[in-house]
C-alpha cells in the first residue's frame, strides 16, 4: 500500500512539474462592433487596438480598452489614394515599432477563389494615422507574386533578426514565408532576389498570423474549413524553419461557426481579442491559460 501511494505521489508530482504544451483558450464574451464592414483583422500596438475591414473602402478604426470591452475613440483611417480605394481588402498589418510598416491586400479575382492577386503596401504608419488616408503615406507597392493564395504580413524574429512572415489561405501547397523587410520595402515583387529568406509548409485556411516573441511561437489564425469555424495553431518557428514544415505545439478549435479573421494578444499572453467577418458578435474577448 505504501509503495502504491509513493508511486501515485511521484506520478502527480511529475504531471504538475511537466511543462504544458501550449495554452488553453476560452471565448469569454462576444461584442458587436459596427462600421467595419466585414472585419478582417486586429492589431494591438502600444495600448492601442486597430480593427480593419472592407466597408465601402478598406479602412482602419482605432479603439481603446474600456473595462473588458473596446471603445471607439473617433479615429478612422481610409485606405484610399486620391479618393480611390486602394487597399480594399486589408489582410494583415506588419508592425514591430521600429521597422517599415506593411499592410497586406488579398484580392479574389474569381468567384471560385482559384485566382488571387496579393499586394503588400509599405506605408508611413505615423503619417497615415495623422492624415487618415494613404495620400502622401504610400511608400511602395509590392506584388506578392511568390504567394499561392493571398498575403497576411506579420513581423517575426528569427536568429535575432526581424522578418515579415506571410501565409496562404487555400487548401493546396500552403506555406508560411519569411521576407527580408530591408529588401521588401524597395522591391516591386516578392520574387525578386533577396526578398524571400525562408519558408515552410502549413495547414490550410490561414486568415492571419500572430508572433509570440517571448515564446518563439507563431500562431496561425485559421478556419477549420473554407470560410467557416475557428482554429488556432501554435507552431515552433525555429523548428518549422529547420524542418521545412510546420512543427505544431498545439491546435485549438473553438466552437464558433462563423469566419474567424484575426486575433491579437494584449499586454500579456493571458487575454486577447478574436475578430470575425460577421455583422454581429464580430469582436470576442478570449481568456488564455498557459
Residue ranges and their predicted role:
Residues 48-79, 127, 131, 230:
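Beta-propeller domains
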Residues 199-242:
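Loop/turn-rich, solvent-exposed surfaces of beta-rich toroidal or solenoidal domains
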Residues 69-107:
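Blade-loop segments of beta-propeller domains
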Residues 243-267:
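Conserved blade-ending motifs and adjacent loop-strand segments that build the rim/top face
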Residues 38-45, 86-102, 147-162, 207-214, ...:
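Structural signature of eukaryotic scaffold interfaces centered on beta-propeller domains
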Residues 30-35, 81-85, 141-148, 197-203, ...:
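Surface loop/turn motifs at the tips and blade-to-blade linkers of beta-strand repeat domains
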Residues 57-64, 110-124, 172-181, 226-237, ...:
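Structural motif
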Residues 30-59:
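Beta-strand-rich domains and repeat architectures in extracellular enzymes and scaffolds
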